[in-house]
Curated annotation (Swiss-Prot):
Superkingdom: Eukaryota
Gene Ontology BP term (one): macroautophagy
Gene3D superfamilies given in the database record: Carbon-nitrogen hydrolase
Record-linked PROSITE patterns: CN_HYDROLASE
Name of the protein described by the UniProt record: Putative nitrilase-like protein YIL165C
Matching InterPro entries: C-N_Hydrolase, C-N_Hydrolase_sf, Nitrilases_CHs
Domain CN hydrolase: 1-82
PANTHER family xrefs: CN HYDROLASE DOMAIN-CONTAINING PROTEIN (PTHR46044:SF1), NITRILASE (PTHR46044)
Organism annotation: Saccharomyces cerevisiae (strain ATCC 204508 / S288c)
GO molecular function, one term: catalytic activity
Pfam families associated with the record: CN_hydrolase
C-alpha cells in the first residue's frame, strides 16, 4: 500500500475488514468442533482470526499516518494536509505530463490493414 501512495503521490485509505472467526462467514463446518483444529490446509484454527484487518491511512510520501489496525474492530481517522499532494508532485508527477499537449500526443492509426498468416 505504501508504494501505491508514494508512486501515485496521493493519500491512500485502505479499509480492510476484520472477522474474528470463520463461523461468521458460514464456514464453521470446516473446523472440527471437538478439537478446534482446521479441516482444510491453510485455514486458521478456531483460535485465530479469520480475517485480521489491517486498515491503514498513508500520505503521498508513503508514510503511515494512521494504523495499521490489526486484530480488532475500529475506526481509523487522520488529519490530512492536502497541500502535501501538490508538494509531493513537484518531484514526481506520475500523470501530469500527459495533460500537456506540447509534450504528449497520442495518435491512433484507424486504417484497416491486411492480415498475413505465416506457418
Amino acid at each position: 500500500m505504501k508504494n501505491i501512495a508514494y508512486e501515485g503521490r496521493l493519500f491512500l485509505i485502505s479499509a480492510v475488514q476484520f472477522m474474528p472467526d470463520a463461523t461468521a462467514m458460514g464456514f464453521g463446518e470446516i473446523i472440527d468442533q471437538a478439537t478446534g483444529k482446521r479441516k482444510l490446509p491453510g485455514w486458521p484454527s478456531a483460535d485465530d482470526n479469520c480475517i485480521n484487518g489491517g486498515s491503514v491511512i498513508i500520505d503521498p510520501y508513503g508514510e503511515i499516518i494512521a494504523g495499521p489496525l490489526l486484530g480488532q474492530e475500529g475506526l481509523l481517522t487522520a488529519e490530512i494536509n492536502t497541500d502535501l499532494i501538490a508538494e509531493a508532485r513537484f518531484d514526481l508527477d506520475p500523470v501530469g505530463h500527459y495533460a500537456r499537449g506540447d509534450v504528449f500526443q497520442l495518435t491512433v492509426n484507424e486504417r484497416s490493414h491486411d492480415v498475413k498468416f505465416t506457418k
